[in-house]
Amino acid sequence: MASHRRTIDRRNFLKLGAVASGVAVGGCGTPEEATTASSTFEFDYRPLGDTGLEVSEVSFGAHGLDRPDLMRAALDAGINTFCVSGNYLDGMEEKALGEAMSTLGSRRDNVVIVTGNDIRPGMSLQRVLDDIDASLRRLRTDHLHVYLTSDVRASEDLRVDALYEGFDRAKEAGKVGHLGLSSHTGGMQPLLNAAIDNGHIEVFFIKYDFVSYPDQDAILRRAAELGIGTMVFKTNAGNRQREIKDLEAGGLSFPQATVKWALTNPYVSSVSVSMTNFDTIRQYSAAAATPLSSAEIAMLRRYADEMYDRYCRFCGECEASCPRGVAVADINRFAMYFSYYGREKEAMRRYHALPDRCSAKACNGCTGPCDAACPFGRLVRAELLEAHRLLCFKEA
């Protein structure tokens, strides 16, 4: 995948791949040492597969954010791609982006909008069409560049004829451009292969980090060869703040390093990151404009080694072993949002939306076959009970 060079030659970047013990380093050349970031940065815009869209190497992830001022600041910094969703809080993110774009005049023509909704088997054609129209209204626009079927867990979630018929109708009317999927499932490899074979999906918007999914790069290469573009998110591999702070010595930034790492993959077009204040816009713009250093590579290796038996890869092995049907992956994700992403209210809301039989209350008195099932040696039952305590503000 070619990228349009503006300042930094990324041919000297090292290619990193996930292995069982941490991060493996390969590729050619010598890593550049970290540079001091200035207040303005220039970075690349990469083609998003065969869509014809050019996306900024970092994109604005607006998860749960109602800040049109930040969105305008990101545009001023050169970020042209915004990832929002119609799923949360009555489309709050879409409304905020719509407000931000309403002040741009002709500049709004440069904005690439990525949004979507949960679309599942059994959903009606009219519901799909209504959801697309609702997103258009909230965004104050007449066209969505990429429309995602969100939070796809397995290939079965792609067997929705109404999705493809509804998308085709909306595309014929000029309302949407390209169909994609978003996912952070543990079964990423079979899902993405199924999506490639599906023939309808043009864009992947997926979790990608240096600890999980050792076979993911081969799948992304296959997708790229067929013209499917890839955007990624959650590059921080759990975002465990205490461990990160211990590693950030000598002015290193762990979040910046993970973005730089993801951009070493030529099959990744853009990294979506949560930009919650003006400083994060500056930090992530700087990350896209500067190479990955040898010190940053060492930091990522140390983190991967330390987190080997503590970071949930959402592989699903433990959940499959649970005799009580506990939603292990969802609960672990909500606990991560609560403890490490500053999204406490959302985490609690989503946990309490689970069916009662799927909550971690069911872990009381269980012998914990999930512990033995985890291929990474995590103490799954204890972590689920702790998650329940956090998300309920009371003991299980």
PLM region spans:
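C-terminal segment of N-terminal export signals and the immediately downstream linker at the start
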Residues: 27-58, 76
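Glycine-rich, proline-tolerant flexible connector loops at the mouths of alpha/beta enzymes
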Residues: 83-102, 152-155
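Structured C-terminal cap/extension of enzyme domains
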Residues: 48, 200, 218, 222-396
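N-terminal secretory signal peptides and thylakoid transit peptides that target proteins
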Residues: 2-21
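Glycine/proline-rich, positively charged
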Residues: 69, 120-233, 239, 249-250, ...
